[in-house]
Amino acid sequence: NLFILPDLPDTAIPTGANVTYFGPGVHNAGVIRIANERGRTLYLDEGAVVLGRVEAENASDLTIRGRGVFCSSQENHGDGRRPQMEFRNCDNLKIEGILLRDTPNWTLKIVGSTGVHIDNIKEIGWIMNSDGMDFICCRNVLVENTFQRNYDDNVTIKAFNGKTDYVTAHTASDGSFTDASIWTVYYLAQNKFDVYDYEIRNCVFWADKAHNMLVGPEARGIAFRNIRFHDNIVLENRQNDGIYPGAMAVMIADNGTFEDIAFENIIVEDIDGGKVFCAHFTNAWAFDGLYGQWARNITLRNIAYTGTRATPSWIRGRSDAQSIDGVTIGNFTVNGAPVTDGSGPHLEINGYVRNVTFE
């Protein structure tokens, strides 16, 4: 595929002692580690190609921006591959304007962080697990104006338990983790935050496999609330299995609770497969094999799918106790025709879903 991603010049180039500047040309940066710092900026100017990856921990007011390219093509893409950029317990993180390509694993892994703003970035990833953005136990997150072509999930919102003893036992003196397994992610959320206040807007998503917009399934008994996806476009989705379907999905799992989750003003183009929307109970990726506790107040509004290959969407509770309560569906259309009930050819709603309103 040829991607043409024009952008306006950046005239506000930062200077100062806290700025690491990458000018035009190729820079072999290796692993950029940022720990216990305030006010650090990495600036990639137009024409810069920075080779490496980022690990940041306990940083505040951290900014990575510019018009350059951050590329991990020279990093390990085999066993023990790491995310392209990894942030743990950071406050007021901003990533803006850059293009990220060829991640070995997750592109942006953001754990236990508050006040995250991601704006106008572009991602191109081809490898399995090349998720675009994975938010784990984060709060107060705004994602806007992105273009993401990832092999795996584009945006996923999760929660894991903090296992500080594991972190301590596998941390080297320089702050890096000696366990390079991709599953180290499970142990990095040192603060077990509830997950709330997310807005993901004005984005273009292409997922070769997996979801475009996903809440769950990893939850560890944590509450998810006030999550809104709106004014986004889905170009591609191919996942069509019984466990992980849905360009937009809420996977109610792992003893978590899920409420006030909205998908609004979403255009889904003629995807190769999968479902437009799916909300269901599952124990996929549940640490103790548990399903979710409950979900309530899920909104689908102004959802337009045009195509013939998507399979019917699902909204499924599991039992009277493990139910979905409060679903609002307004102007959900398939090829221009409105979906007006939960028993037609495009949407299935089972008997464990209560208080459904079609507007």
Model segments located where?
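Extracellular/periplasmic carbohydrate-active domains that bind, remodel
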Residues: 1-359
